Amino acid sequence: MPAATMATPGYLACRTSVATLLFFVLLRRAAILGAGGAPSPARIVDYLIGYTRVGDMDKLYSQYADRYLDVTLHGCERAVVDPLGDMRHVLASEGASGQEFTASVIWYYVFPDVCFAPVFRREYLRCIRPRKLEDCYTTSPFMWTREFYVDAFLAGSGTGIELLGLNKKLTGTYMLVVRVGTTTRTALVTVNVVGECPTTMEEVTTTLRGNCWRGRQYTTDFNGDGMYLFDTEEEHRRIVYKAYQDKLKVASPNATDAPISYPRAYTGADERLAPYTLQPVSTDDHYLPGCPWGIGCDLDQTSASGVIEIEDHDESDVRLVSYPPPTLPSPGPGGNENGAGYSDNRPDPKVVGPTVGPGAIILVVMCAPILIGLTAFTIRKYC
């Protein structure tokens, strides 16, 4: 383009308008990011991803958990796993001051080399004297990895999950991390699948492996890839139960209608379990002899289960923490906290996306018509 043309007032005005419009777009994005609503790596912008930092998962994993639980699933059995149980005393303690606080519930699948793959996450903001997590005024949508996890609130505590028709590839250790204000509660659940359930979906552990992060990466970030957004738990329940019925039909083709049995309930012990003394493990890798997963296998067929832990990313420091297995309750429904005898007059929590401050909203509303109109006029006249 000739220099004379580039210097014309129309051309300069066109470039100025385009630059102004670009500045407006960047300003709006900066307002959203500055308000704590950064888009997730999975590009799901209406999820409050990363608002509550997880912290160093290696430290959480190497410390003694508040609850330990062993779960054995037979074939296409379904089970409600609620290791932490009633959280009302924790919520009451954090809310005693009357100050707002945040909370989060995250389940991880833990690989033998101590790599954490999130399978469920939900966050709660603006919690003011809540009786249960759902009383918080702002709640993020449900985020799931795969459709065989369902109904995080069936157990009543708001932190449990239901497992339906897991296959043997998902045998291993699951870690629950619940943060309520300044309080953290953890649980390690060893899931052993006895008997195969038909697979009606893609290779699951491969997907989890591709989306697992090392412990210290969770201190400053969170990987949202591989997780799916469900606006309502009813939508997720419909999808997962349909997949579960398909599995049952494959397992029992002669059945006219695939029945969905009532789930078994697995809950944690009433008191914190005291771990045994740490025992050194002599092994060249992260796997125990005769234990394909390296986690959650019996030590001598009669002793307690164990879990490998690695501290400070030193792969030579592999230790085994053994603990007494809890006594499992009789099969039956998980409790329902909503029927605890109190009335809840709070408004329904809102599922919201990234939050934007009032100043940013006013600025966008005032400047948008002017900038868009100026840009359109200039482009029509000079470009």
Curated annotation (Swiss-Prot):
Q: What is its main location?
A: virion
Q: Gene3D superfamilies per the record?
A: 2.70.230.10
Pfam families according to UniProt: Herpes_glycop_D
Membrane topology (Virion surface): 31-358
Q: Where is the signal peptide?
A: 1-30
An example Gene Ontology biological process:
symbiont entry into host cell
Q: Which residues lie on this side of the membrane: Intravirion?
A: 380-383
Entry's transmembrane regions: 359-379
Protein's membrane topology = Single-pass type I membrane protein
Annotated Pro residues bias:
323-332
Region annotation (Profusion) ranges: 244-311
Query: Where found?
Result: Virion membrane
Gene Ontology cellular-component annotations: membrane; viral envelope; virion membrane
Which Cys pairs are S-S linked?
76-197, 115-212, 127-136
Q: What is this protein called?
A: Envelope glycoprotein D
Residue segments, region Disordered: 315-349
Record's keyword terms, sorted:
Disulfide bond, Glycoprotein, Host-virus interaction, Membrane, Signal, Transmembrane, Transmembrane helix, Viral attachment to host cell, Viral attachment to host entry receptor, Viral envelope protein, Virion, Virus entry into host cell
Question: What function does the entry list?
Answer: Envelope glycoprotein that binds to host cell entry receptors, promoting the virus entry into host cells. May trigger fusion with host membrane, by recruiting the fusion machinery composed of gB and gH/gL.
